[in-house]
Regions:
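Basic, polyanion-binding surface patches
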Residues: 7-195
Length: 195
């Protein structure tokens, strides 16, 4: 048997694949936009590496590369907005992720509307499905992993927005769009208080 192939008794074949590709299978939640406001400038970055860490208060872990313009802003101000775009914004979201706030006013360049938040200086994005105002509550993993722990402090949504499907990055320039919803709330007896 070759080392790159594993044959189980039931005839299922498995092959190895590069560890550098594991994130293609484990991409977490939907692609989001993270806004910051630093030194008089609002900025937007595209982000897909984030995860929920706690229900209440809502804690969100997110990775922001130290090479990103937003890293300095987030580290300096300790606040941001996580805006959740629907799939009708996918082209703009990808374009936002392919330029830098160092030299581009992304709100103007991509025709997005900044709106004032209630508890943070970073702006909401009016065109998004939802916006979560966040404050950085833990930076202990920033130096080693570029990971910020955020607490959601105020949340907004647009109930009249027609397009509500979000999308997920596969990490290779392809995306998966949310589709059919399967309602199994009745089975969630252990977590009923969170629904």
């Amino acid at each position: 048997m070759r080392s790159a192939e594993l044959r189980y008794e039931r005839g299922i074949n498995m092959r190895t694949f590069p560890l550098s590709k594991t994130f293609h299978l484990l991409e977490p939640g939907p692609v989001v936009l993270l806004t910051t406001f630093h030194k008089g400038r609002a900025n937007i970055m595209t982000m897909s590496w984030h995860m929920m860490m706690e229900f209440e208060p809502p804690l969100i872990g997110c990775l922001v590369s130290g090479a990103n313009y937003s890293f300095t802003a987030l580290r300096g101000t300790r606040e941001c907005v996580i805006a959740i775009p629907a799939v009708d914004l996918i082209s703009k979201v990808v374009d936002i992720g392919n330029c830098s706030g160092d030299d581009v006013d992304k709100f103007a360049a991509f025709g997005l509307t900044p709106r004032p938040a209630k508890l943070v200086k970073a702006p909401l994005i009016a065109e998004c499905l939802a916006n979560i105002e966040c404050k950085v509550v833990d930076t202990s993993l920033v130096n080693k992993y570029n990971m910020f722990i955020l607490e959601g402090v105020y949340a907004w949504s647009d109930p009249k927005r027609k397009e509500r499907r979000t999308f997920h990055a596969n990490g290779d320039g392809t995306f998966v769009v949310d589709g059919r919803t399967i309602d199994l709330k009745k089975k969630m007896v252990k977590w009923k208080s969170l629904l």
